[in-house]
């Protein structure tokens, strides 16, 4: 349960961060999952960004009047 809460907080931090900070946050999340994940050698975690919109976080477009 604690792991789920921690991962949820980390994921929220990743999604709320600007693009450059997302890469750092994903590296932290990936390192955490590799260190504290299940003991099976066949389980691998990879967290990657889809490099979506680079304009995220700039706010709404301004209104344009005629």
Swiss-Prot record:
Cystine pairings recorded for this chain: none
Keywords on record: Secreted, Signal
Tissue-specificity statement: Expressed in the ADL, ASE and ASH sensory neurons, the URA motor neurons and the MC, M2 and M4 pharyngeal neurons.
Gene: flp-21
Gene Ontology CC annotations of this record: extracellular space
GO BP term, example: neuropeptide signaling pathway
UniProt name for this protein: FMRFamide-like neuropeptide 21
Gene Ontology molecular-function annotations: neuropeptide Y receptor binding
Family: Belongs to the FARP (FMRFamide related peptide) family.
Disruption phenotype: Exacerbates bordering behavior, where animals accumulate at the edges of culture media. Enhances clumping/aggregation behavior in a G-protein coupled receptor npr-1 mutant background. Decreases locomotion quiescence, in an npr-1 mutant background, during the sleep-like state called lethargus which occurs during molting between larval and adult stages.
Keyword Signal: yes
Cellular compartment(s): Secreted
Secreted listed as a keyword: yes
């Amino acid at each position: 349960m604690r792991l789920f809460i921690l991962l949820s907080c980390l994921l929220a931090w990743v999604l709320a961060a600007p693009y450059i900070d997302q890469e750092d946050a994903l590296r932290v999340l990936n390192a955490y999952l590799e260190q504290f994940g299940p003991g099976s050698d066949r389980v691998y975690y990879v967290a990657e960004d889809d490099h979506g919109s680079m304009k995220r976080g700039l706010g709404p477009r301004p209104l344009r009047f005629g």
